[in-house]
Amino acid sequence: MTSKRRNNGRGKKGRGHVKYIRCTNCARCVPKDKAIKKFVIRNIVEAAAVRDISDASVYEVYALPKLYAKLLYCVSCAIHSKIVRNRSREARKDRTPPIRFRPMRGEGGQNARPGQANKLFNMSPRK
């Protein structure tokens, strides 16, 4: 039978069995090597309240703690929540991670937004 992917959608090479984990979203059992992993680092305090807390703090330079979470998704939940997308047969062979959006100062002192990257850098949109 033909294979859709070189790794059959898994990271298991030479191992007979891999432990199962539960999907963060739907609690489905998924092999650990097949699960789509997403590591999220967020501030515990939302951005709107950071200034209020820093003003009310006794310490002048207090670094607010961050929330670290490793999210593990089954394939269907990852597709549904747009963490991964369907790709063409040729694009599936490309194993490089997607380019991450990093906000930079744009023209006129405005913060760049994901939808306006083309205007700031005169790039054509991806298809």
Swiss-Prot record:
A GO cellular component entry from the record: cytoplasmic side of rough endoplasmic reticulum membrane
Biased composition (Basic and acidic residues): 87-97
Gene Ontology molecular functions: mRNA binding; structural constituent of ribosome
Protein localization: Cytoplasm, Cytosol; Cytoplasm; Rough endoplasmic reticulum
Domain of life, source organism: Eukaryota
Example of a GO biological process term: cytoplasmic translation
One protein family per Pfam: Ribosomal_S26e
Keywords from the named record: Cytoplasm, Endoplasmic reticulum, Ribonucleoprotein, Ribosomal protein
Annotated stretches, region: Disordered: 86-127
Xref: PANTHER family: 40S RIBOSOMAL PROTEIN S26
Similarity comment text for this entry: Belongs to the eukaryotic ribosomal protein eS26 family.
Known partners and oligomeric status: Component of the 40S small ribosomal subunit.
Protein name as it appears in the record: Small ribosomal subunit protein eS26
Organism: Octopus vulgaris
